[in-house]
Amino acid sequence: EFRSLARKWINANAPKEFEQELSKSSLGRIRLAKHDMVEVGKAWQKKKSDGGWACLHWPKEYGGRGATPIERVIWQQEEGVYGKLTQPFQIGEGMCGPTVMAWGSEEAKRRYLPKLASGEEIWCQLFSEPSAGSDVAGLRTRAEKKGDNWVVNGQKIWTSGAHYSDYGLLIARTDPNVPKHKGLTMFFLDMKSPGVEVRPIKQANGMQEFNEVYFTDVVIPDSQR
């Protein structure tokens, strides 16, 4: 029953004008980029949200459907190539959103999660650094407490989608005097904050999916950790 409902909705609402391009895998994505993939993705995400098909496994009160893991897999099978359209939302839906859901305040959940689910806002994660990839504990980006705020200085790299993201999850070192796997704190921040500089990395295939991100005296409220 769930599969037939999903299939019926997708057949009636999917942007079929992109089906041929999307079926060509990465080459299709390069060609689709001429249409502004982020804006096309936002439109598809909003349509899914309006129909009750966005972020299926999330609770309904945060913009999801309350679906089971099996139903989520069925949806992904039925969505097929159109799932590529929402690539800009994959990190937000799969990583950032669930983190806010698990550790954020109720106010933060109700403010940010529905807008992520509806396609209005995009999130990225700011973990890797030039000296900290697989071992994130080697990171050097610092956050220092000043009153009710934290001031962040440092650099991240290989950040997918930072150049079009509205918000990001950031891990920074808040206590340099303890073993490296301790003294780390996670924040979320507005990517348009003063002191945030995003530099896209041009890839050999012509695309720019990854970025360097620099933080210079970026102020983050204590309520965003």
Where are these regions (language model features)?
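A short, Trp-centered hydrophobic/proline-enriched beta-strand micro-motif
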Residues: G119-F127, I171
